[in-house]
């Protein structure tokens, strides 16, 4: 049994807390376990005391207060009620001032990361340019600039795809600058007809695809250069994955341009230039990831994959085991067949992968009874292996998607200002002076894309 307090002590006093019409009763000793919080500090709590009803009144979210009061009763255990949205509960926790440690544990339990601060440049002109290119939601001009950037990205991707069509592709392997590297002294025209020695050769710089590509690269380079010059921190800028993607998007053009100029001057080997340009052309396809800067859906997909790396790793590991196991089994089951496609275990890897992923091209198929049994088991094992981690990945996607939508809805609403019930004399022990309204702490949670901004 707990020792009883002497009569003069007020720690056993029963307090009535009225939260939006719902009355709670507890002891002052319970709230006093955390004296740095709003309810644990008598001076701060007294601002909300109603003398007429002899109770403390808080016009706040009622379902959240059960967990807040349990935090005091349990000695520091904070659990969000299942029917309370995360952003609403975090606002209530911030209002009652339960502390950074409790919020950190809650974020860890909920899997809610702290939004990183996005610094702003000190100079006004640099700050305007940074907001214009980095924050599309900051102004109407920034939205227009984002639309232009998306259109340029789409044009670049369309050109990348169109130049591989037979009607536009030369007989040589490659297009644009890569095509010229293999063309020799007499490149073929766009219509595919043969180029006679008497006709002037078509240089790659006159190619319409090259012109459009050059215009797109000029825009990408200008955009990247402006953001690099006005960014508040060069270290943070180069650590950003999106900025690295922007750099990779323009790098192939300049490498291909330098290779082509060197080829025309007779510097370097033509075969080596063609090999380099083929790799460079493949890198150009990564330009499509620039759209993720302007697409919330791609950002949510990236967050889902990042949060599901463990499950994806297990999936790849299970597939690896299954591929080795079933490719070995089908090889020994079909080894006696003269016309067998399974000539070795490595040759059977392709069949095992296609079968376990339930694609089934049919280019390789077992013929013997034993091989068919192995194929059936391989297909069943593939279905089970792939289906196991899928619910976890879907759950992660649903979590990030709802967090994004709830964050957008939260920005449309604001709380009614809490007005204390009466004045409090002095400001001792953390109290407030007469007429002062307690301020809410700064926002401790923000949806993806809504970051705190500070000047550096």
UniProtKB/Swiss-Prot annotation:
<dbReference type="GO" id="GO:0005251">
    <property type="term" value="F:delayed rectifier potassium channel activity"/>
</dbReference>
<keyword id="KW-0813">Transport</keyword>
<dbReference type="Pfam" id="PF00520">
    <property type="entry name" value="Ion_trans"/>
</dbReference>
<feature type="short sequence motif" description="Selectivity filter">
    <location>
        <begin position="358"/>
        <end position="363"/>
    </location>
</feature>
<dbReference type="GO" id="GO:0008076">
    <property type="term" value="C:voltage-gated potassium channel complex"/>
</dbReference>
<dbReference type="GO" id="GO:0016020">
    <property type="term" value="C:membrane"/>
</dbReference>
<feature type="lipid moiety-binding region" description="S-palmitoyl cysteine">
    <location>
        <position position="231"/>
    </location>
</feature>
<dbReference type="InterPro" id="IPR000210">
    <property type="entry name" value="BTB/POZ_dom"/>
</dbReference>
<dbReference type="InterPro" id="IPR028325">
    <property type="entry name" value="VG_K_chnl"/>
</dbReference>
<keyword id="KW-0630">Potassium</keyword>
<dbReference type="InterPro" id="IPR003131">
    <property type="entry name" value="T1-type_BTB"/>
</dbReference>
<keyword id="KW-0406">Ion transport</keyword>
<keyword id="KW-0851">Voltage-gated channel</keyword>
<dbReference type="Pfam" id="PF02214">
    <property type="entry name" value="BTB_2"/>
</dbReference>
<comment type="function">
    <text>Mediates the voltage-dependent potassium ion permeability of excitable membranes. Assuming opened or closed conformations in response to the voltage difference across the membrane, the protein forms a potassium-selective channel through which potassium ions may pass in accordance with their electrochemical gradient.</text>
</comment>
<keyword id="KW-0449">Lipoprotein</keyword>
<protein>
    <recommendedName>
        <fullName>Potassium voltage-gated channel subfamily A member 7</fullName>
    </recommendedName>
</protein>
<feature type="transmembrane region" description="Helical; Voltage-sensor; Name=Segment S4">
    <location>
        <begin position="276"/>
        <end position="295"/>
    </location>
</feature>
<dbReference type="InterPro" id="IPR003968">
    <property type="entry name" value="K_chnl_volt-dep_Kv"/>
</dbReference>
<keyword id="KW-0407">Ion channel</keyword>
<dbReference type="GO" id="GO:0005886">
    <property type="term" value="C:plasma membrane"/>
</dbReference>
<dbReference type="InterPro" id="IPR048219">
    <property type="entry name" value="KCNA7_BTB_POZ"/>
</dbReference>
<feature type="transmembrane region" description="Helical; Name=Segment S1">
    <location>
        <begin position="144"/>
        <end position="164"/>
    </location>
</feature>
<keyword id="KW-0633">Potassium transport</keyword>
<keyword id="KW-1133">Transmembrane helix</keyword>
<dbReference type="GO" id="GO:0001508">
    <property type="term" value="P:action potential"/>
</dbReference>
<dbReference type="InterPro" id="IPR003972">
    <property type="entry name" value="K_chnl_volt-dep_Kv1"/>
</dbReference>
<feature type="transmembrane region" description="Helical; Name=Segment S6">
    <location>
        <begin position="373"/>
        <end position="393"/>
    </location>
</feature>
<feature type="transmembrane region" description="Helical; Name=Segment S3">
    <location>
        <begin position="241"/>
        <end position="261"/>
    </location>
</feature>
<keyword id="KW-0812">Transmembrane</keyword>
<dbReference type="GO" id="GO:0051260">
    <property type="term" value="P:protein homooligomerization"/>
</dbReference>
<keyword id="KW-0325">Glycoprotein</keyword>
<keyword id="KW-0631">Potassium channel</keyword>
<feature type="transmembrane region" description="Helical; Name=Segment S5">
    <location>
        <begin position="312"/>
        <end position="332"/>
    </location>
</feature>
<feature type="transmembrane region" description="Helical; Name=Segment S2">
    <location>
        <begin position="209"/>
        <end position="229"/>
    </location>
</feature>
<dbReference type="InterPro" id="IPR027359">
    <property type="entry name" value="Volt_channel_dom_sf"/>
</dbReference>
<comment type="subunit">
    <text>Heterotetramer of potassium channel proteins.</text>
</comment>
<feature type="glycosylation site" description="N-linked (GlcNAc...) asparagine">
    <location>
        <position position="191"/>
    </location>
</feature>
<dbReference type="InterPro" id="IPR011333">
    <property type="entry name" value="SKP1/BTB/POZ_sf"/>
</dbReference>
<comment type="similarity">
    <text>Belongs to the potassium channel family. A (Shaker) (TC 1.A.1.2) subfamily. Kv1.7/KCNA7 sub-subfamily.</text>
</comment>
<dbReference type="GO" id="GO:0071805">
    <property type="term" value="P:potassium ion transmembrane transport"/>
</dbReference>
<keyword id="KW-0564">Palmitate</keyword>
């Amino acid at each position: 049994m707990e020792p009883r307090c002497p009569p003069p002590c007020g720690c056993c006093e029963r307090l009535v807390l009225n939260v939006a019409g719902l009355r709670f009763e507890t002891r002052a000793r319970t709230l006093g376990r955390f004296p740095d919080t709003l309810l644990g500090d008598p001076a701060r709590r007294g601002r909300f005391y109603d003398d007429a009803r002899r109770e403390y009144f808080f016009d706040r979210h009622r379902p959240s207060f059960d967990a807040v009061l349990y935090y005091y009763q349990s000695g520091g255990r904070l659990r969000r009620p299942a029917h309370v949205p995360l952003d609403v509960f975090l606002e209530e926790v911030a209002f009652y001032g339960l502390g950074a440690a409790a919020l950190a544990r809650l974020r860890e339990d909920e899997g809610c990361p702290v939004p990183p601060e996005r610094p702003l440049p000190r100079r006004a002109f640099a700050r305007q340019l940074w907001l214009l290119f980095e924050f599309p939601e900051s102004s109407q001009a920034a939205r227009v600039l984002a639309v232009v950037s998306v259109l340029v990205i789409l044009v670049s991707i369309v050109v990348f795809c169109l130049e591989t069509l037979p009607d536009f592709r030369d007989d040589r392997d490659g297009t644009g600058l890569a095509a010229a590297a293999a063309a020799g002294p007499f490149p073929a025209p766009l219509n595919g007809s043969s180029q006679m020695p008497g006709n002037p050769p078509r240089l790659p710089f006159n190619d319409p695809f090259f012109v459009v590509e050059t215009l797109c690269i000029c825009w990408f380079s200008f955009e990247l250069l402006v953001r690099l010059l006005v960014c508040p921190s060069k270290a943070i800028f180069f650590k950003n994955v999106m900025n690295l993607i922007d750099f990779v998007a323009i790098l192939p053009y300049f490498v291909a341009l330098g290779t082509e100029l060197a080829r025309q001057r007779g510097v370097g080997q033509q075969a080596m230039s063609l090999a380099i340009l083929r790799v460079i052309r493949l890198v150009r396809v990564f330009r499509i990831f620039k759209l993720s800067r302007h697409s919330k859906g791609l950002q949510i997909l990236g967050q889902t994959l990042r949060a599901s790396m463990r499950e994806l790793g297990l999936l790849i590991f299970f597939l690896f085991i299954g591929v080795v196991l079933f490719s070995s089994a089908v090889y020994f089951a079909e080894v006696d067949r003269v016309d067998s496609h399974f000539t070795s275990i490595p040759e059977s890897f392709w069949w095992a992968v296609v079968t376990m992923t339930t694609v089934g091209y049919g280019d390789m198929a077992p013929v013997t009874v034993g091989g068919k049994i192995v194929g059936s088991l391989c297909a069943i094992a593939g279905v089970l292996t792939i289906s196991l981690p899928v619910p976890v990945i879907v759950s992660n996607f649903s979590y990030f998607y709802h967090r994004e939508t709830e964050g957008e809805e939260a920005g449309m609403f604001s709380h009614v200002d809490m007005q204390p019930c009466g004045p409090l004399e002095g400001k001792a022990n953390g109290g407030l002076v007469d007429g002062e309204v307690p301020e809410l702490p700064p926002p401790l949670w923000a949806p993806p894309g809504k970051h705190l901004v500070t000047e550096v």
